[in-house]
């Protein structure tokens, strides 16, 4: 079964499209899900469940469109700021299994908050900085493998 966002991309379900490019697309969420006027979802056009599965090139195109949408929100709606929200993978509260970024317009004193009011209960015994630095030393290799895997899935 196809994911809901892939169905939108294939025009099986109507959407309020803001932009459709070769590698990324942007649309408004359903009115009942909108967090603010102009709240926009930006997705890669090639299915990736989350950020871990997306190819570097797909992610770059998606983020370039996120920036264009952010500029349009500022210029057209007068929102001086935006929040970028994304959830990816188990435990993240990801609502649709297709990588997506919420671009939420923000105005001073809009009454909206995005920061959690409490810290995570999860603990890591070792130094998170050291663990992440070690993982990053091999991240380029993993990223290349992930991109190659995504390229194979497209062909």
List the predicted regions and their residue ranges:
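HIT superfamily nucleotide-processing domains
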Residues: 1-155
